[in-house]
Amino acid sequence: MRMRLLFVKDFLDLIFPRNCELCTRALFDYEFCLCTICEGKLPITSYHLRATDNDLKDKLQGLTRVLRVLAFLKFTKNGKSQRLLHQLKYRNKPQVGYYLGKKYGQLLLKQDYSKSWDCIVPVPLHRMKLKRRGYNQSEEFAKGLAESLGIQMENILE
């Protein structure tokens, strides 16, 4: 039975190869969405280490009252983070959102953030966009984040 499953998996990989979302290299069995090389080059911020004192918090402070600001990736035009967001939003790749949420959750776990929140709440998507896209990219990210942190995700916003 195991040999049959391996054959089916190998056959599916031949017809529908799993490639890195950034460099398009073939992924190994232990990789998901990004190859190890591209994952290592992600522009990850250190905002989770200093959520009360970072430049993004300073920028938002003038707009609204903010206690803490966390961000996973630094956004640069035409950079890796923008390419991943475009895959997620415009190329029908919800797994990218889940992957990014899961990775960010793993990073936050190292700083013991799992005890900081009661639940993860995704930002709702306009119903017309949801109908067109078929999924809410924020919800996909929230699913991965909630799973990594071991807390509930709840769709409580409209």
Regions found by a protein language model. Give the residues of each.
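Glycine-rich phosphate/pyrophosphate-handling loop used in enzymes and phosphotransfer proteins
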Residues: M1-E158
